[in-house]
Amino acid sequence: MTNIRKTHPLMKIINDSFIDLPTPSNISAWWNFGSLLGVCLVIQILTGLFLAMHYTSDTLTAFSSVAHICRDVNYGWLIRNIHANGASMFFMCLFLHVGRGIYYGSYLYKETWNIGVILLLTVMATAFVGYVLPWGQMSFWGATVITNLLSAIPYIGNTLVEWIWGGFSVDKATLTRFFAFHFILPFIILAMVVVHLLFLHETGSNNPTGLDPNSDKIPFHPYYTIKDILGLFLTIITLLSLAMFSPDLLGDPDNFTPANPLNTPPHIKPEWYFLFAYAILRSIPNKLGGVLALLASILILLIMPLLHTSTQRSMMFRPISQTLFWMLTANLIILTWIGGQPVEQPYITIGQWASISYFTIIIILMPLAGMLENYMLKPKFP
């Protein structure tokens, strides 16, 4: 009798995706983040669902309802802390996952990569609207500042902003619709993740060498299920430690003050995972230019396959490209730091140089490094 997991229409899909999936035998721990992102998404949806049962999306009661969750709901404090810090873990895994894709040339699977970039944008949108919901000072002013950026769009800008706000300022209508968006987007993300996996399984996984792995593949289960479970345990331990011992480490103290339209916080800044893009936005004095640079900082990932000039896929055997990659990583850390600093010297100049070098490394230096490495690898007989 044939095994049911290989014949049942639904079980067959699960079997071909997570059990009998032929996987390269040499993929490293950098390939763990896909499964970790899946786990993060499930954790966020579940904790979010329980929070939504007690939350009220009304400007008068939103802040109090969050306080009520933390004080009066059974384990509400834990659910809220896991949800808030789970977002940070989600982005940490996302950035490492994207970084892995850049380093090992995974962007050459164009369909998978493009869906991945759209996923990144959707997750960022979800996190932004979610940050507005507790209706603290930073929630309110963050929403005001970021939505206001759309007014830089010529001709329709102001109308568009008022349409998104549902009035002439960030108010009850804005909070209600942001809650609706925050509720629906994770399920859209879930559907897109399925498409992401569908495209990935059309080609199979890449591997650290960037070479064709078809000659040496092993079943996903038990080898990589065990490996993923190890990564899962480490992630959950980190998340729980963060949520229980220092839940407010990554948050903003201003968000403990209820939203007040008459009082602007001294430094308006988003959560840490948006700071790099925020720094790029602030480094351009022109409003429209800043918005375009902000969009370009993420959308530049879409042209990565076009900028690939090397004959090799992975950076594993390309030391010049490796150096540039780690320079880019350091650059992003600097941008993240600058995004959290006040708009004054020397931070303005550092931010501008870091923004210029971010785009220069990706658009100019990396393709040049690929061409140089190609030249150096050519045999030169006397």
Curated annotation (Swiss-Prot):
Bilayer-crossing regions: 33-53, 77-98, 113-133, 178-198, 226-246, 288-308, 320-340, 347-367
Superkingdom of this protein's organism: Eukaryota
Cofactor(s) needed: heme b
Topology term for the membrane: Multi-pass membrane protein
Keywords of the record: Electron transport, Heme, Iron, Membrane, Metal-binding, Mitochondrion, Mitochondrion inner membrane, Respiratory chain, Transmembrane, Transmembrane helix, Transport, Ubiquinone
Residues that bind heme b b566: 97, 196
Residues annotated to bind a ubiquinone: 201
Location(s), subcellular: Mitochondrion inner membrane
UniProt binding sites for heme b b562: 83, 182
Subunit structure: The cytochrome bc1 complex contains 11 subunits: 3 respiratory subunits (MT-CYB, CYC1 and UQCRFS1), 2 core proteins (UQCRC1 and UQCRC2) and 6 low-molecular weight proteins (UQCRH/QCR6, UQCRB/QCR7, UQCRQ/QCR8, UQCR10/QCR9, UQCR11/QCR10 and a cleavage product of UQCRFS1). This cytochrome bc1 complex then forms a dimer.
Protein's UniProt name: Cytochrome b
Gene (name only): MT-CYB
